Each structure stands twice: as C-alpha cells, then as structure tokens.
Regions:
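Conserved acetyl-CoA-binding loop-helix of GNAT-fold acetyltransferases
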Residues: 64, 70-83
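Conserved active-site alpha-helix within GNAT-family acetyltransferase domains
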Residues: 95-122
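Conserved beta-strand in the GNAT
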Residues: 38, 43-52, 56-63
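Conserved GNAT acetyl-CoA-binding A-motif
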Residues: 83-96
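Short amphipathic alpha-helix that is part of the acyltransferase structural core
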Residues: 1-31, 36-38, 112, 127-141
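Hydrophobic, well-ordered beta-alpha structural blocks that scaffold small-molecule cofactor pockets
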Residues: 46-49, 75-80, 100-103
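Acidic/histidine-enriched, beta-strand-rich ligand/metal-binding domains
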Residues: 60-61, 67-69, 103
Length: 141
C-alpha cells in the first residue's frame, strides 16, 4: 500500500470533504465545528470529523472511498485523529459495525454527555444505532 497522508483539513476547505462525500453518494456532511481529518493519496480517500463535547469528543462522518476499504485506512485515520485529542471519544454506529470499532479499542457505552444522549435518542427513532466510546487511556495502548 502506498504511503498515505493522514492530516487535518482546515475548516476553510470543508467544502472539499463535503464534495468527497457527495461524489460517493453519501449523505454525510463535514462538521462545521471541530477538527476535520482526511486520508489522502493525491486526493481525499477518507474523512471524518471530531467535535468537542463536554469533556471529550464526538467522532462523526467516517467514510472511506469504496476501493480503499479493507486496507486499514479507516483505522489509521481514526488513530491519527485520536492521538491529537485528550479525553474520551464517542461515536454512534449501526450495531453491525461494533466489531470493527472494538478492534480499535472502542466499547459499547450507555454513559454519554447529555447532549449526545439526547441526539442518540432522537436518531434512534429512525435507525438502529449504538453508542461506543474510548477513553484516553485506551487510546494510548
């Protein structure tokens, strides 16, 4: 696999990440707040957003270009992003993705900041989602 560039994307370039999502038929949108992270092989091949919430961060918008899936890009992008932040990180995902995230150190949680608990309750009305989290200590293992 070629050397990929994992780095932050300035908010001023957020439209590039939104364009990447749209080009692959994803309804995801890059967060207007927080850090945007991308993996590049020339152009963007994966992206995610990390938004500060309470004493930690909320990971959203993880998407990898289909031809790059199964090659470790998502895990490496997450690892690079989480290495730069202190405190716990949470995400919501479909239950089928639980194993993928558990391999990265995340675990199922029901303890969420109230703002995220409210979002999860609202989102869960229309789709099947679970909450996962990772502590600062687990990020460093």
């Amino acid at each position: 696999m070629p050397d990929l560039d994992y780095s932050t994307l300035p908010q001023s370039l957020r439209p590039l990440l939104d364009k990447f999502y749209r080009a692959h038929g994803s309804s995801m949108r890059a967060s207007g707040e927080g850090q945007l992270w991308v993996a590049r092989d020339g152009g963007i091949i994966a992206g995610l957003s990390l938004t500060a919430v309470m004493e930690g961060f909320w990971l959203t918008g993880l998407f990898v270009e289909p031809r790059w899936r199964g090659r470790g890009v998502a895990g490496e992008l997450i690892a690079n992003a989480l290495a730069t932040v202190a405190g716990p990180t949470w995400l919501f995902c479909h239950p089928d993705l639980r194993g993928f995230y558990e391999k990265l150190g995340f675990s199922h949680t029901t303890r969420l900041p109230q703002a995220l608990a409210d979002r999860l309750a609202r989102y869960s009305r229309s789709k099947s989602l679970i909450a996962l989290g990772i502590s600062s200590a687990a990020k460093n293992e």
